[in-house]
């Protein structure tokens, strides 16, 4: 299945929010230790809850929040798994739906270039984790992830929310 770290963006109010996985441009990421992933949630007229699906690990529903970054602690990734993030919308709201953000999570990277890209992302996520509960300027963060094209779609400051997945609305896929 192809990956695309950017999802959402349809005209429907629920699906209009842009969702972006903060991963290398290859859409493949080995989280390493500590195991963290991050989703950038764009502006939305009516924010919806966020559904996070990670392969066979499970599906979690996180509460609706305004634009910002969700830094998420995850269970161990023992094999390559598809990670999908999408808003929770009823079919009546949008029968077609916008594509979810999709990325591959890996237990480790095999190629040196991928290892270096993963390390840069881990350093960015580590810096974000130090600022949980505060905010970060959007423009430098977007540059760090080669996402400058989103600058006009986001507020100048993005709140950082840090949350574990394990205790939140776990559902077996």
Language-model regions: role of each:
Residues 28-42:
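Contiguous beta-strand segments within globular domains
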Residues 1-32, 114:
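Short, compositionally biased P/S/T/A/G/V-rich stretches that sit at domain boundaries
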Residues 39, 67-76:
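Exposed aromatic-hydrophobic patches
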């Amino acid at each position: 299945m192809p990956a695309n770290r950017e999802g959402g963006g349809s005209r429907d109010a629920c699906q209009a929010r842009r969702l972006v996985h903060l991963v290398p441009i290859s859409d493949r990421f080995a989280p390493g230790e500590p195991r963290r992933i991050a989703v950038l949630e764009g502006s939305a007229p009516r924010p919806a809850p966020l559904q996070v699906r990670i392969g066979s690990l499970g599906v979690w529903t996180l509460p609706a929040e305004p634009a910002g970054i969700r830094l998420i602690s995850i269970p161990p990734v023992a094999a390559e798994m598809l990670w999908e993030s999408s808003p929770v919308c009823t079919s009546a709201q949008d029968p077609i739906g916008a594509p979810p953000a999709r990325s591959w999570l890996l237990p480790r990277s095999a190629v040196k270039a991928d290892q270096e890209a993963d390390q840069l992302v881990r350093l960015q996520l580590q810096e974000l984790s130090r600022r949980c509960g505060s905010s970060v300027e959007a423009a430098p963060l977007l540059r760090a992830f080669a996402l400058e094209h989103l600058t006009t779609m986001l507020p100048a400051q993005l709140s950082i929310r840090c949350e574990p997945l394990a205790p939140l609305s776990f559902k077996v896929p």
